[in-house]
UniProtKB/Swiss-Prot annotation:
Keyword line: Metal-binding, Zinc, Zinc-finger
Chain intervals annotated as zinc finger (RING-type): 78-119
Protein name in UniProt: Uncharacterized 15.0 kDa protein in GTA-P79 intergenic region
MF-aspect GO terms: zinc ion binding
InterPro entries assigned to the protein according to its UniProt record, in alphabetical order: Znf_RING, Znf_RING/FYVE/PHD
Length: 131
């Protein structure tokens, strides 16, 4: 029983010492951007990670709880520059859930906050900072 309490206390201390999972900013075009601090290029279940990250952001109340986040399958490459998403992180647009531009192209091309794939309006973006 004592070991369980010590383990729980150690986990709490560790959780407090870790940096936050993401940063929240507003880009120059007025879109709220969540930039996830940890990004592993070898991750296979990218959609699963995006879904879990979005749930954490909702739990933290940085994203409205009623926000629909239907994350779509990620394309294999950026639709503009053709960089492989196996090497470069994609930006996920919400509410549509598409991930079709790399971070670089999103910052230079997507000035009107519309998804390049489905043309729907974007209010939130989920980005990943590379290690």
């Amino acid at each position: 029983m004592h070991d369980g309490r010590v383990k729980t206390q150690a986990l709490r201390v560790l959780a407090r010492s870790l940096p936050p999972l993401y940063d929240s900013t507003v880009d120059r075009h007025g879109c709220k951007v969540f930039t996830v601090r940890r990004y592993n290029r070898r991750v296979i279940d990218f959609a699963g990670i995006r879904n879990k990250t979005l749930e954490i952001i909702k739990t933290d109340r940085n994203l409205p709880l009623n926000t629909e986040c239907n994350v779509k399958v990620v394309d294999s490459a950026c639709m503009r520059c053709r960089k492989s998403f196996a090497v470069y992180p994609a930006v996920t647009y919400l509410h549509c859930g598409h991930s079709c531009l790399c971070t670089d192209c999103d910052e230079t091309v997507n000035v009107d906050n519309t998804c390049p794939k489905c043309k729907s309006g974007i209010r939130y973006k989920l980005k990943y900072k590379t290690l």
